[in-house]
Amino acid sequence: MNPPEICIIGDNCVDLYPQQEKKYAGGNAVNTAVAVKRNGIECGYLGIVGNDENGKRIIDALQKEAIDCQRLRQQEGNTAWTKVLLDEGDRIFIEDSLEVQKEWDLEEQDYLYLDKFNWVHHTIFSN
Protein backbone atom coordinates (compact mmCIF):
# COMPACT_ATOMS: atom_id res chain seq x y z
CA MET A 1 0.00 0.00 0.00
CA ASN A 2 1.28 3.46 -0.89
CA PRO A 3 1.47 6.14 1.79
CA PRO A 4 -1.77 8.12 2.07
CA GLU A 5 -1.86 11.17 -0.18
CA ILE A 6 -4.89 13.08 1.08
CA CYS A 7 -6.99 13.21 4.24
CA ILE A 8 -10.67 14.03 4.03
CA ILE A 9 -12.06 15.71 7.16
CA GLY A 10 -15.68 16.19 7.98
CA ASP A 11 -19.21 15.00 7.98
CA ASN A 12 -20.68 11.58 7.70
CA CYS A 13 -24.24 10.42 8.02
CA VAL A 14 -26.48 7.56 7.18
CA ASP A 15 -28.91 8.42 4.41
CA LEU A 16 -32.32 6.98 5.28
CA TYR A 17 -34.69 6.29 2.39
CA PRO A 18 -37.99 5.52 4.18
CA GLN A 19 -39.94 4.85 0.96
CA GLN A 20 -37.48 2.11 -0.03
CA GLU A 21 -36.66 1.04 3.54
CA LYS A 22 -32.94 1.42 2.70
CA LYS A 23 -29.94 2.94 4.51
CA TYR A 24 -26.64 4.03 2.98
CA ALA A 25 -23.39 5.37 4.39
CA GLY A 26 -22.96 8.93 3.17
CA GLY A 27 -22.14 12.51 3.96
CA ASN A 28 -20.05 14.89 1.87
CA ALA A 29 -16.68 13.95 3.37
CA VAL A 30 -17.33 10.19 3.31
CA ASN A 31 -18.53 10.36 -0.30
CA THR A 32 -15.43 12.37 -1.24
CA ALA A 33 -13.10 9.89 0.47
CA VAL A 34 -14.72 6.98 -1.37
CA ALA A 35 -14.49 8.79 -4.72
CA VAL A 36 -10.82 9.68 -4.13
CA LYS A 37 -9.95 6.09 -3.20
CA ARG A 38 -11.85 4.63 -6.16
CA ASN A 39 -9.77 6.89 -8.39
CA GLY A 40 -6.61 5.23 -7.13
CA ILE A 41 -5.46 7.80 -4.57
CA GLU A 42 -4.59 6.57 -1.08
CA CYS A 43 -6.54 8.55 1.49
CA GLY A 44 -7.58 8.82 5.09
CA TYR A 45 -10.78 9.97 6.73
CA LEU A 46 -11.01 11.99 9.93
CA GLY A 47 -14.40 12.33 11.59
CA ILE A 48 -16.66 11.06 14.36
CA VAL A 49 -19.49 8.54 14.53
CA GLY A 50 -21.73 7.30 17.30
CA ASN A 51 -21.45 3.86 18.85
CA ASP A 52 -24.71 2.79 17.22
CA GLU A 53 -25.62 0.61 14.24
CA ASN A 54 -25.30 3.59 11.87
CA GLY A 55 -21.79 4.33 13.14
CA LYS A 56 -20.83 0.75 12.37
CA ARG A 57 -22.33 1.16 8.89
CA ILE A 58 -20.07 4.19 8.23
CA ILE A 59 -16.97 2.41 9.57
CA ASP A 60 -17.70 -0.72 7.54
CA ALA A 61 -18.21 1.30 4.34
CA LEU A 62 -14.89 3.13 4.77
CA GLN A 63 -12.98 -0.04 5.68
CA LYS A 64 -14.49 -1.88 2.70
CA GLU A 65 -12.88 0.78 0.48
CA ALA A 66 -9.53 0.41 2.35
CA ILE A 67 -9.62 4.03 3.52
CA ASP A 68 -7.34 4.80 6.47
CA CYS A 69 -9.66 5.28 9.46
CA GLN A 70 -7.21 5.35 12.35
CA ARG A 71 -8.48 8.80 13.48
CA LEU A 72 -12.16 8.08 12.93
CA ARG A 73 -13.48 8.45 16.46
CA GLN A 74 -16.43 6.60 17.89
CA GLN A 75 -18.31 8.31 20.71
CA GLU A 76 -21.21 7.36 22.94
CA GLY A 77 -24.37 8.47 21.14
CA ASN A 78 -25.98 8.40 17.73
CA THR A 79 -24.44 8.88 14.31
CA ALA A 80 -25.73 11.71 12.11
CA TRP A 81 -28.56 10.85 9.74
CA THR A 82 -30.53 12.37 6.89
CA LYS A 83 -33.98 11.37 5.64
CA VAL A 84 -34.20 11.38 1.87
CA LEU A 85 -37.19 11.02 -0.43
CA LEU A 86 -36.98 10.17 -4.11
CA ASP A 87 -39.20 12.03 -6.55
CA GLU A 88 -38.78 10.88 -10.16
CA GLY A 89 -35.11 10.14 -9.47
CA ASP A 90 -34.37 13.42 -7.68
CA ARG A 91 -33.31 13.30 -4.04
CA ILE A 92 -35.23 15.51 -1.62
CA PHE A 93 -33.57 15.92 1.77
CA ILE A 94 -36.40 16.37 4.25
CA GLU A 95 -34.86 16.04 7.72
CA ASP A 96 -31.49 15.55 9.37
CA SER A 97 -29.68 15.53 12.68
CA LEU A 98 -25.96 16.00 13.37
CA GLU A 99 -26.06 13.95 16.58
CA VAL A 100 -22.47 13.33 17.89
CA GLN A 101 -21.01 15.67 15.26
CA LYS A 102 -22.59 18.69 16.99
CA GLU A 103 -19.75 19.03 19.49
CA TRP A 104 -16.93 17.40 17.50
CA ASP A 105 -13.61 19.20 17.25
CA LEU A 106 -10.08 18.23 16.29
CA GLU A 107 -7.71 17.01 18.99
CA GLU A 108 -3.92 17.29 19.19
CA GLN A 109 -3.53 13.72 17.89
CA ASP A 110 -5.62 14.63 14.84
CA TYR A 111 -3.15 17.36 13.87
CA LEU A 112 -0.25 14.92 14.24
CA TYR A 113 -2.13 12.45 12.03
CA LEU A 114 -2.65 15.14 9.37
CA ASP A 115 1.12 15.73 9.15
CA LYS A 116 1.58 12.51 7.17
CA PHE A 117 -0.61 13.68 4.28
CA ASN A 118 0.38 15.85 1.32
CA TRP A 119 -3.14 17.26 1.03
CA VAL A 120 -6.11 17.89 3.32
CA HIS A 121 -9.69 18.39 2.15
CA HIS A 122 -12.47 19.44 4.49
CA THR A 123 -16.14 19.97 3.91
CA ILE A 124 -18.24 22.94 4.94
CA PHE A 125 -19.74 20.71 7.64
CA SER A 126 -16.37 20.00 9.32
CA ASN A 127 -16.97 22.28 12.32
Question: What are these model-predicted stretches?
Answer:
Residues M1-Q20:
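Positively charged, low-complexity intrinsically disordered leader regions
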Residues I8, G26, Q74:
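Conserved strand-loop elements at the edges of beta-sheets that form or border functional pockets
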Residues V14-Q19, K23, I41-H122:
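Conserved N-terminal subdomain of the carbohydrate kinase-like
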Residues N28-A29, T79:
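Short glycine/serine/threonine-rich phosphate/pyrophosphate-binding segments
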Residues A29-R38:
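Histidine-anchored nucleotide/phosphate-binding helix
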Residues F125:
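Flexible loop residues that form catalytic
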